[in-house]
Amino acid sequence: MASEELQKDLEEVKVLLEKATRKRVRDALTAEKSKIETEIKNKMQQKSQKKAELLDNEKPAAVVAPITTGYTVKISNYGWDQSDKFVKIYITLTGVHQVPTENVQVHFTERSFDLLVKNLNGKSYSMIVNNLLKPISVEGSSKKVKTDTVLILCRKKVENTRWDYLTQVEKECKEKEKPSYDTETDPSEGLMNVLKKIYEDGDDDMKRTINKAWVESREKQAKGDTEF
């Protein structure tokens, strides 16, 4: 029954209650009056509850501002050393200890690692190192975040072995720079190879100096041959 109808019934019961003189009739009307008032109260509560629900549904959804990570910076500066069990890579990043733990991620494979630091001062930082000099244990490798520093711990697959370089590429580049000496050839031939490399890599002044020394050496040899 609508609230308006209940209100009309209540008014009529009140009128009858005022006119009634017999106790039995008055008790019945009083009980009916209480019943109608309770129904009206329940109707009003239901109406208020529905109104509140409608207002909640009409509220705009809260807008969550996206976390801006800006652009990604590639990390090129780092230091490293080693122990019998680990190769340790040190990366300096100011404030890295203040970002959430889940923002510092490292993925390991047997011959590589990939570091990603997200949302540090509005930027992300990335470092990918492939072709490690020797295999590492993926399960035994880990990271530590210290004050302004990320420490990457690569567990050596074979302990008590020395790494002269961090990567295979670095090793190959360094070995190319070394002059090649063949211990089985004549020492003078090895010296000539070194001089030849210096000549090829040198500037014009260096080439003139070597040419002059070469001519003087040949002249001395020729002079020595004629004295015997």
UniProtKB/Swiss-Prot annotation:
Annotated region (Interaction with SKP1), positions in chain: 73-228
Spell out the GO cellular component terms annotated for this protein, sorted alphabetically and separated by semicolons: beta-catenin destruction complex; cell body; cytosol; extracellular exosome; nuclear envelope lumen; nucleoplasm; nucleus; SCF ubiquitin ligase complex
One family from Pfam that matches here is: Siah-Interact_N
Q: What is its main location?
A: nucleus
Does this entry carry the keyword Metal-binding? no
In-chain residues carrying the UniProt-annotated modification Phosphoserine: 3, 34
Q: Does the keyword Cell cycle apply?
A: no
The chain positions of domain SGS read: 168-228
Checking SUPFAM superfamilies in the record gives: Calcyclin-binding protein-like, HSP20-like chaperones
Q: Where is this protein localized, as stated in its record?
A: Nucleus; Cytoplasm
Give every CS domain span: 73-167
InterPro entries (alphabetical): CacyBP_N, Calcyclin-binding_UBL-bridge, CS_CacyBP, CS_dom, HSP20-like_chaperone, SGS_dom, Siah-Interact_N
**PTMs?**
Phosphorylated on serine residues. Phosphorylated upon induction by RA or at high calcium concentrations.
Any one Gene Ontology MF annotation carried by this entry is: protein domain specific binding
Matching entries from CDD domains are given as:
p23_CacyBP (cd06468)
Q: In this chain, where does the modification N-acetylalanine occur?
A: 2
* Protein keywords: Acetylation, Cytoplasm, Nucleus, Phosphoprotein, Ubl conjugation pathway
Residue ranges for the region (Interaction with SIAH1) are 2-80
Q: Which residues carry this modification: N6-acetyllysine?
A: 8, 19, 85, 118
Query: What are the BP-aspect GO terms?
Result: cardiac muscle cell differentiation; cellular response to calcium ion; cellular response to leukemia inhibitory factor; heart development; positive regulation of DNA replication; response to growth hormone
Superkingdom, taxonomy of origin: Eukaryota
Q: What does this protein do?
A: May be involved in calcium-dependent ubiquitination and subsequent proteasomal degradation of target proteins. Probably serves as a molecular bridge in ubiquitin E3 complexes. Participates in the ubiquitin-mediated degradation of beta-catenin (CTNNB1).
Cite the record's note on assembly.
Homodimer. Interacts with proteins of the S100 family S100A1, S100A6, S100B, S100P and S100A12 in a calcium-dependent manner. Component of some large E3 complex at least composed of UBE2D1, SIAH1, CACYBP/SIP, SKP1, APC and TBL1X. Interacts directly with SIAH1, SIAH2 and SKP1.
- PANTHER family cross-referenced by the UniProt entry: CALCYCLIN-BINDING PROTEIN (PTHR13164:SF3), CALICYLIN BINDING PROTEIN (PTHR13164)
Q: What is this protein called?
A: Calcyclin-binding protein
